[in-house]
Amino acid sequence: MSNFITAPINENGIILDPDIGSILKDAMSPPFRFTDVFVYSHGWWTDATGAVADYNRFSMELTKQLLLIGATSPTLPHLPASSFATAVQWPSTLSFYSMGKRADVVGQHGVYALLRMIFEALSALAAPPSLRLHLLGHSFGCRVVCSALEQISKDGTQVPPAVALDVVLLQAAFNSDELDPNGMYGNASKLNLRLLVTRSDGDTSLGRWYPIAERLVNLFSGRSVSALGAAGPSAVTQTEFGGAGAIAVGPGFTYPAVVPLTERLIAADLSPLHAATGPGYLFSGHHSDIYHDEIYQLIAGFFFR
């Protein structure tokens, strides 16, 4: 059985549902015994209605792939027996310049608080169950996720020993070196987590427009930047994670291809898949082209191997 809630967070990172703490405490306590918890953040230019539609589509299509995988042989050994999902809703329909900062605020305060509530509820139990916590972000939602992890790491919050932490960043809209030790999210790698990042040559938003916008914001820095979702993780980031596994995702990709990769950091190239699906949108290309069976198979193989 699966359960799903939404967590509305305003532009100041304040959770607008006053009951969210008690809901999460109940969810982490008996008689519930969830094996997997998902926290997902949407990206830029998504209103509340659009966010719900995105979450509904993503969760249903991922669930469909998990059921199909469960019926295959050999199957993935750690498919979720019972899951609980939290969908983060935050106001993201402003300019590029405003949204980057807002995403960090939402993560640093709102999603950080959600994670603290989950950890504290588990730690209060006499015998906390084993739990896999899966964080997913798309576009600026990756900033939401990473700023929350950065804050968890910096303030010394103890992730309960029974919690296994996995993170997926789909077409992340931040600089490719922000996970370096001196980057905005440089402390996140110190947590005991596994990380899957995707990139694509077909992502026009990140490959073409993101560097221009960053240069305008930092006019006098003289620094050339690339987005993580366009260039992939920097060499320094890969070293910080102890190396990176690399995989290309094309038409017909299935989960067995990612299962053998044991590195903490996996870099997945979606370029072959996007190239096979046409030119994409005029402005954004394939930036939001994440609703494919092959991508769900990639995520499943990473999370549940």
Task: Give the ranges of each region predicted by the language model.
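Gly/Ala-rich beta-loop-alpha elbow adjacent to hydrolase catalytic centers
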Residues: L136-G141, V145
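Long, contiguous juxta-domain segments that are non-catalytic but functionally important
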Residues: M1-F32, T49, L67, A71-T75
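Short hydrophobic segments within beta-strands
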Residues: Y40-S41, L136, T198
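Surface-exposed alpha-helical segments enriched in charged/polar residues
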Residues: K25, S29, M60-T63, R116, ...
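Lipolytic serine-hydrolase domain surface
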Residues: M1-P18, W44-W45, A53-N56, H78-P80, ...
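Short, surface-exposed "cap/lid" segments of acyl-processing enzymes
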Residues: S29-L94
